[in-house]
Amino acid sequence: MPRGQKSKLRARGKRRETHDQPQGLTGPQATAEKQEESRSSSSSSAVCQGARRRSSGSSVPQESQGASPTGYPDAGASCSKYDVAAMGQDEKSPSTSRDASVSQESQGASPIGPPDAGISCSKSDEAAKGQNEKSPSTSRDASVPQESQGASPTGSPDADVSGSKSDVAAKGQDEESLSSSKRAAFFTTTDGDPIKRKANKMVQFLQKKFEKKEPILKADMLKRLRRQYKPCFPEILKRTSEHLTVFFGVELKETDSSGESYTLVSKLGLSNEGSLSGDNALPKSGLLMSILGLIFMRGNRATEEEVWKFLGLLGIYDGILHSIYGDARKIITEDLVQDKYVVYRQVCNSDPPCYEFLWGPRAYAETTKMRVLRVLAEINNTSPGLYPHLYEDALTDEVERALRLRA
């Protein structure tokens, strides 16, 4: 080879060497470094691919929260530890949200839920049922003292002895209310019962007849009825007799066997010259029956307060004119006192002054406690024996009267 060509080749080789030195190492060292770079790049790509798979699994809650389900194209290549940690938190958040949803559904009475929630709910339901099963027995136990507080049939002997007086007083109050209960019903409105309404009008008609001392005839009573009510005359006459007993303490009796004429007779056996005479004869007789009965039930004396309380049950009030009895205060404190049927006096040592009523001498002479008790029992469709202590008192009075007559 010519000398000039060899020199040119050597110059080219030197230029190549100088050109390859800044580009990197040569030989086996360079190949080793290239292998390390390839391994590192493959491992980083594997981590990013796993992160992508995890992010795709957690995309559902992100979408529900309004987050975008997709990312940038080169996000996988530049994936870092912070991205992996964030994705781990996202994976935890769905489970947390599920647990929270369980509590919300259980509060909202959702019919479905996770198995654990169902088990816990079933336990709470069983506990609630147990409490409900206990509650009836508790309520029954609680009802026992309530029943024992009101009219318990049993008790200790000491309690019976100490409560005997209060029992007698309670019985007296019950008898008082019983004697006025049916009477109060007669003073109620009668618009819904035409027979009762006709009976009330018949009572007013007979009252006027009696005060004028005119005969009471069946023909006159039939004239007061319209044609459609004439077949009901026996029932109307029966109701009229009941009303007369309740209002005035008198009964309607036939004066002859033909049944064409009637008269009014006192149920208490009072004389016609007494309470059944003069003005307001029937109202006086009715109020007298009420006052004598109350005095008897209250232990042979009744305060003025007790009298007005009793009359109030019948719709009779102090200072108010009654449609049947008129001025009740005048009758019981003046008329009946003057006729000596009742005694109206001030209670001893009462301050402020308090007044009471007692039977008068004329009442003791013309009637008896037994008659009064029988009338009250008849009004209430009962028998005198249903009032044991009153019946015993009335029997004692009968015996004393018989002994006085023998003497």
From Swiss-Prot:
SMART domains associated with the record: MAGE, MAGE_N
Basic residues bias locations: 1-16
The organism of origin for this protein: Homo sapiens
Organism ancestry: Eukaryota, Metazoa, Chordata, Craniata, Vertebrata
InterPro entries the UniProt entry points to: MAGE (IPR037445), MAGE_N (IPR021072), MAGE_WH1 (IPR041898), MAGE_WH2 (IPR041899), MHD_dom (IPR002190)
Cellular component, GO annotation: nucleus
Leader sequence segment: none
One family name in Pfam for this protein: MAGE
Bias (Basic and acidic residues) ranges: 123-132
Biased composition, class Polar residues, residue ranges: 56-68, 94-109, 133-155
Any one GO BP annotation for this protein: negative regulation of transcription by RNA polymerase II
Gene name, Swiss-Prot/TrEMBL: MAGEB6B
Superkingdom assignment: Eukaryota
The MAGE domain, residue ranges: 195-394
Positions of region (Disordered): 1-185
Protein name, as recorded: Melanoma-associated antigen B6B
